[in-house]
Amino acid sequence: VKYRVVLLTLVGALALSSCTLVAPNSAPSRVKTVPFGLLSPTIPGTNHARVRFITQPVYIVDAAGDLAPSSRIVPEPPALATVIEQLLLGPTHIEKSAGYTSALPKSLVVLSATVDEATGVGVIDFGSSLNALPPKQQLLAIGQLVLTADVVGAKRGLEIRVAGVTQNVLLPSGKHATLVTPRDFQSLLNG
């Protein structure tokens, strides 16, 4: 019985060791067919259109507590929703090490963000309000949004909504407005 166990163990080990004995090939082999067009020069599902990327400014809070532009890479043409998503990611590691921050809460959820081409007014709809933020942080957060939206095409201003309801937001002057413009927040820019 002992010899059988040893013999079966040796046969099993030999059988398993042969699984790893693959003849190495010194040259890579060419794959003839790749499914789903994964090697094509365009992104699958884009109707053979090439996606181009550009740098787009977003506004973050510098070490002095002022708003400053910083570049992000986004698909061209830049859509407000895409640029706001980049803004919500906050400063990069390099920017953080230089003292840059964001006044926007990390938990902020964008429901929609669009610019009406005819009017030049941007609308961002959030899942929660910015009113819970301290006043200084709220001003910086709104400034980040309106200045970033301006460079994407919201030249006439920005309307901030929460679950579809237009918000009356705080301005640096202490007043409130439903449509905020970049001019309202010029005093928060660095320099």
Regions found by a protein language model. Give the residues of each.
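Bimodal "functional hotspot" detector
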Residues: 1-191
